């Protein structure tokens, strides 16, 4: 049934580490792009290990983080880099918002506690290749998510709940774009 779904383009909700492993495999085998919205980056790292080479050979895209959680950060950095035409050391983005978290997101967060992987979400370059990581200063890129007052905008700021996932997505996109 998943194979037919891959051929016809459908969607599936998370937790992605529980429901989407076979789906991504089927997409790669069928030559179908995979797009989703997950912050389960340890699972995403495992996807990269399992499928990146085959997807690249078939010229298909596996993009597991392409929703509101990641697109503003990822595309904002891309366009800022392109506009300034220089290497960027740090980008801070701010927005005002409110809302809630879906049941699927909560279930995904809890399911990651039991997900077995050799990787750690705490690594700032979790989604990058070993070759790329060798060129980066890991200690300068550690997460520093704090509530703080921002003089430039005269407001208090708290980290976005998905910041730990987004920083890794942006770093991977940067590596892929630089190739």
Protein language model features and the residues they cover:
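Short, small-residue-biased leader/transition segments that mark boundaries at the very start
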Residues: 2-7
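Rossmann-like NAD(P)-binding element
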Residues: 8-18
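ADP-ribose/adenylate-binding Rossmann-like module
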Residues: 15, 26-45
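Short glycine-rich anion-binding loops that position phosphate/pyrophosphate groups of nucleotides
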Residues: 15-16, 67-68, 132
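Rossmann-fold NAD(P)-binding glycine/threonine-rich loop
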Residues: 38-60
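Adenosine-phosphate binding glycine-rich loop
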Residues: 54, 58-98
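Active-site-lining helix/loop region of Rossmann-like oxidoreductase modules
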Residues: 82-179
């Amino acid at each position: 049934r998943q194979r037919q779904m891959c051929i016809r383009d459908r969607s599936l909700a998370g937790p992605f580490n529980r429901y989407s492993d076979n789906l991504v495999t089927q997409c790669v085998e069928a030559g179908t792009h995979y797009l989703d919205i997950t912050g389960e980056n340890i699972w995403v790292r495992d996807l990269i290990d399992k499928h990146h080479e085959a997807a690249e050979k078939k010229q298909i895209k596996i993009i597991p983080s392409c929703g509101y959680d990641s697109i503003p950060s990822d595309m904002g950095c891309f366009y800022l880099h392109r506009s300034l035409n220089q290497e960027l050391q740090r980008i801070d983005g701010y927005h005002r918002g409110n809302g809630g978290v879906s049941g699927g997101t909560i279930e995904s967060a809890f399911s990651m506690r039991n997900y077995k992987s050799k990787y750690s979400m705490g690594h700032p370059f979790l989604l990058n290749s070993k070759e790329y990581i060798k060129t980066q200063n890991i200690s300068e890129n550690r997460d520093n998510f704090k509530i703080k007052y921002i003089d430039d905008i005269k407001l208090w700021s708290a980290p976005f709940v998905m910041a730990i996932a987004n920083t890794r997505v942006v770093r991977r996109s940067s590596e892929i774009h630089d190739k």
